[in-house]
Regions:
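C-terminal or internal capping secondary-structure element at the end of a domain, subdomain, or sheet
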Residues: 218-228
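Acidic (Asp/Glu-rich) sequence patches and key acidic residues
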Residues: 4-206, 214, 228
Length: 228
């Protein structure tokens, strides 16, 4: 709809946990595809009637003799052949309209053998090594950006101390996570991942504690660059 088109477009990293015996990467991402290109699988779509646009015809009857003429000329909307109504087929659970493995977050993962990759089995990821690298980068960033706009561009908040900034930037996490059961997990307004009905369960837990620590270490973590 109109509001959807006006939303700010952005890229964000998603961690997809893939079970080699379960759904493939494409199958895990499919339920969250936006229908902007008209190629989203039909099973995930719902028809959204253009109610507001139809009601607006009342204010334009002097210029358009029929509703059909108004909808097609003013909005460029034709009647849907399947429903016989004016509207759009949309995915109510849409989270992305384009994706690429790695992308802007290429080689985000570090293996215990020392090489970087876009995907690794959990058992092969060097979590401590990634923490130390991120910590070093955070210290260098803080020390080289004492003042000015570059603080904001590097994720330094107004009320940050050096310690709080380093702690936050050293933690590995992605914007969202898709678990092998196909569920999409993203942070709520409290900054917590929505994997529990009790927000206190996750208040002090890290990405690692929530998604990695107790997971099957044979799972493959794939870093995906998504756009919406």
């Amino acid at each position: 709809n109109i509001e959807r088109k006006l939303e700010i477009k952005m890229h964000f990293p998603v961690g997809v946990l893939v079970d080699k015996k379960g759904k493939k990467l494409e199958e895990l991402l499919a339920p969250y595809q936006e229908n902007t290109m008209g190629n989203c699988p039909k099973e995930f779509l719902e028809f959204m009637e253009a109610t507001e646009e139809i009601n607006e015809y009342e204010d334009h009857k002097e210029d358009y003799e029929t509703l059909d003429e108004f909808m097609e000329d003013y909005y460029g909307i034709e009647k849907d052949k399947e429903t016989g109504k004016y509207g759009y087929w949309e995915n109510p659970n849409a989270q992305w309209d384009w994706y690429q493995i790695g992308g802007r977050w290429s080689n985000m993962l570090l293996s215990k053998n020392g090489y970087k990759s876009n995907y690794l089995q959990l058992k092969d990821i060097d979590w401590n090594g990634m923490y130390e690298i991120s910590k070093k980068q955070a210290i260098e960033t803080w020390d080289s950006n004492e003042n000015g706009i570059y603080r904001m561009l590097n994720g330094i908040k107004k009320d940050d101390t050096k310690e709080s900034y380093i702690e936050r930037m050293s933690k590995f996490e992605t914007y969202a996570v898709i678990t092998p059961d196909g569920k999409w997990h993203s942070k709520d307004k409290m900054g917590l991942f929505s994997v529990s009905t009790n927000e206190d369960d996750n208040r002090n837990k890290s990405f690692y504690d929530i998604f990695i620590k107790d997971a099957d270490q044979e799972l493959i973590l794939v870093i995906v660059d998504c756009h919406i």
